[in-house]
Design a protein with these regions (language model features):
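N-terminal helical cap/lid subdomain that shapes the substrate entry/recognition surface
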Residues: 3-101, 105
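Conserved phosphate-coupling serine/threonine residues in phosphotransfer and NTP-handling enzymes
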Residues: 113
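Short beta-strand/loop segments at the ligand-binding rim of alpha/beta enzyme cores
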Residues: 108-109, 184
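Asp-based, Mg2+/Mn2+-dependent phosphohydrolase catalytic module
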Residues: 1-11, 101, 116, 120-217
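Secondary-structure boundary/capping positions in well-ordered alpha/beta enzyme cores
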Residues: 42, 67-68, 106-107, 129-130, ...
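Short glycine- and Lys/Arg-enriched binding-loop motifs that mark or flank ligand-binding interfaces
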Residues: 15, 109, 165
C-alpha cells in the first residue's frame, strides 16, 4: 500500500455495517441457525458464520442450502422472517456513537452494506439512524459488494469525487469495493487487510481527520 494520502479533501465518511458499526455475530448466528433448524439442518459451522457475516441474506442461504432441494423454499422463508426478535442480540461497536456525533456536521456520514431489509430496523433499534445522512443496503443496488455500486451511489448523491471519500470496513469485500471505486480504505479491527489506516477504536478516526476540532475529541 502506498503512503497514506492527504485527508484534507475528505468530505464523506462511509461505513460498513456488520463488524464495523455493530457486533452482529450473535444475532446472525441465531438468525441463520433458526432457518437451518426450520429445515432440519445442523447449526452453522465457524466457516459458514464467517461467510454470512459479510454476505447478503440471499447469498448466505444459497451457500447454506447448496445442493439442497429446499433452497428456494428457504429463500422464501428468510425473506418472510420478522427480524425484530434477533435485534436484541445486536451490540453497537464501542464509541461509535461518540465518533459519529463528533464527525457531524463537518463531514457527511453514510453506510454501504450488504445487509438488506433489516438495516433500517437495526439503525433504529440502536439509535444510530439520526447519525447518518444516507444509507445504501443490498436492496438499493443491483450488484452487491465487492462490486463498488454502493460506494458509487454515495459519491453521486453527495456529488463527491472518489478522493473526497473514505470507506471504513473490516472484510476483503470492503477493500475490493474501495479499490474499484477509488476511495480511501480504512480497516477496522482487521490488521490483515491492506489499508491506508487501521483502526482499533472508532475514536481513533477523529485523530487523523483535519476538520474535527480538539474540543470534539
Amino acid at each position: 500500500m502506498p503512503d497514506a494520502p492527504s485527508l484534507t479533501a475528505i468530505k464523506v465518511i462511509i461505513y460498513d455495517c456488520d463488524g464495523v458499526l455493530i457486533d452482529s455475530r450473535g444475532s446472525n448466528t441465531a438468525f441463520y441457525n433458526h432457518i437451518l433448524e426450520k429445515f432440519g439442518l445442523p447449526p452453522l459451522t465457524p466457516r459458514q458464520l464467517d461467510f454470512v457475516q459479510f454476505s447478503t441474506a440471499q447469498a448466505a442461504v444459497d451457500l447454506l442450502f447448496q445442493g439442497s432441494p429446499w433452497r428456494e423454499e428457504a429463500q422464501n422463508y428468510q425473506r418472510s422472517i420478522d427480524n425484530r426478535p434477533f435485534l436484541a442480540l445486536l451490540r453497537p461497536e464501542p464509541h461509535i456513537r461518540e465518533a459519529l456525533a463528533a464527525l457531524r456536521p463537518a463531514y457527511h456520514t453514510a453506510i454501504a452494506t450488504n445487509r438488506g431489509k433489516s438495516l433500517p430496523l437495526v439503525l433504529r433499534e440502536l439509535g444510530l439512524a439520526p447519525l447518518f445522512d444516507l444509507t445504501i443496503s443490498s436492496y438499493d443496488v443491483t450488484r452487491q459488494k465487492p462490486h463498488p455500486e454502493c460506494l458509487l451511489k454515495i459519491l453521486e448523491h453527495f456529488r463527491a469525487a472518489a478522493a473526497e471519500a473514505m470507506y471504513i470496513g473490516d472484510a476483503a469485500v470492503d477493500l475490493e469495493a474501495s479499490r474499484r471505486a477509488g476511495v480511501i480504505f480504512v480497516a477496522y479491527r482487521n490488521p490483515d487487510l491492506e489499508a491506508y489506516y487501521h483502526l482499533q477504536d472508532h475514536l481513533e478516526l477523529l485523530e487523523i481527520l483535519p476538520r474535527v476540532s480538539k474540543a470534539d475529541k
